[in-house]
């Protein structure tokens, strides 16, 4: 691991947006990567959720900002603004749901319309643990990815299969990280902060956490942006800036 990535240079930060239909397990993929855990009781996201993770690679250290989006049709109008300024997009489908696979074409088109041609796109077939219910073959996924000029991988968030491999591939393709190979040594450790005290959120307000007071974000998602928008500075000594003004939120979120 490059020492310069830790002390000599500012931490490179990249925005990754996760897209796909409802119930394809986008949140499960992010949670498996971020916490190495799986929860069968996730609720559908209403709007946008945000998590961050620091990856320590052989060629340096990078900060990933992971944006988890809602798949419901009624919330589709919120998504384009979060595609913008993304370095990479992960478009997920459920291998047991052929409609979710067919809809990936539209999601990829949205990425290229809103983010431009430089956004790195990965097509992900998730839930390979349900092989007996498979409706989309590996070959179909590979063929579609090739036709749309994106990368492809199948994953199983429930058991963690190929999840780290997915993020390694994305990291290797990010600007300035092209020399990072899939087989390079990697430490997925996170910046360690003390576990926060449990806090409650009252209606119309928000609960704010600051690493400066030995607290961090709760260890279990989702973190909703409906009540409170959080921007985390991913530096060696992270800081937290919290904006709790509901007037800044879109009308449809209030």
Swiss-Prot record:
Its EC number is 3.6.5.2. Its cofactor is Mg(2+). One of its GO terms (cellular component) is Golgi apparatus. SUPFAM superfamilies: P-loop containing nucleoside triphosphate hydrolases. The keyword Metal-binding applies. A motif (Switch 2) lies at residues 69-88. Keywords: GTP-binding, Hydrolase, Magnesium, Metal-binding, Nucleotide-binding. A motif (Switch 1) lies at residues 32-50. GO terms for molecular function: GTP binding; GTPase activity. GTP binds at residues 23-28, 39-40, 42, 71, 126-127, 129, 157-158. Mg(2+) binds at residues 27, 68. InterPro entries: P-loop_NTPase, Rab, Small_GTP-bd, Small_GTPase. GO terms for biological process: intra-Golgi vesicle-mediated transport; intracellular protein transport; protein localization to Golgi membrane; retrograde transport, endosome to Golgi; retrograde vesicle-mediated transport, Golgi to endoplasmic reticulum. It catalyses: GTP + H2O = GDP + phosphate + H(+). It is an enzyme of class 3 (hydrolase). Belongs to the small GTPase superfamily. Rab family. Switch 1, switch 2 and the interswitch regions are characteristic of Rab GTPases and mediate the interactions with Rab downstream effectors. The switch regions undergo conformational changes upon nucleotide binding which drives interaction with specific sets of effector proteins, with most effectors only binding to GTP-bound Rab. PANTHER family: RAS-RELATED PROTEIN RAB (PTHR47977). The small GTPases Rab are key regulators of intracellular membrane trafficking, from the formation of transport vesicles to their fusion with membranes. Rabs cycle between an inactive GDP-bound form and an active GTP-bound form that is able to recruit to membranes different sets of downstream effectors directly responsible for vesicle formation, movement, tethering and fusion. This is Ras-related protein Rab-6D. It comes from Homo sapiens (Human).
């Amino acid at each position: 691991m490059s020492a310069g990535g830790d002390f000599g240079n500012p931490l490179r930060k990249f925005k990754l947006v996760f897209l796909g239909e409802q119930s394809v397990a986008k949140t499960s993929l992010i949670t498996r990567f971020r916490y190495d855990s799986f929860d069968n009781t996730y609720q559908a996201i209403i709007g946008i959720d945000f998590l961050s993770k620091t990856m320590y690679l052989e060629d340096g250290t990078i900060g990933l900002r992971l944006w988890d989006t809602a798949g419901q049709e009624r919330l589709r109008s919120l998504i384009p603004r979060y595609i913008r300024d993304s370095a990479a997009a992960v478009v997920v489908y459920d291998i047991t749901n052929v409609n979710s696979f067919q809809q990936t074409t539209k999601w990829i088109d949205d990425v290229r319309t809103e983010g431009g041609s430089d956004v790195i796109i990965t097509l992900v077939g998730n839930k390979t643990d349900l092989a007996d219910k498979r409706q989309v073959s590996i070959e179909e996924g590979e063929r579609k990815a090739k036709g749309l000029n994106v990368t492809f991988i199948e994953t199983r968030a429930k058991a963690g299969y190929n999840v780290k491999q997915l993020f390694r591939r994305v990291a290797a393709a990010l600007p300035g990280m092209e020399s990072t190979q899939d087989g390079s040594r990697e430490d997925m450790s996170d910046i360690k902060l003390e576990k926060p005290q449990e806090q409650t959120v009252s209606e119309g307000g928000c609960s704010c956490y600051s690493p400066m007071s030995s607290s961090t974000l709760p260890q279990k998602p989702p973190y909703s942006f409906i009540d409170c928008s959080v921007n985390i500075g991913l530096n060696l000594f992270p800081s937290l800036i919290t904006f709790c003004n509901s007037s800044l939120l879109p009308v449809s979120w209030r």
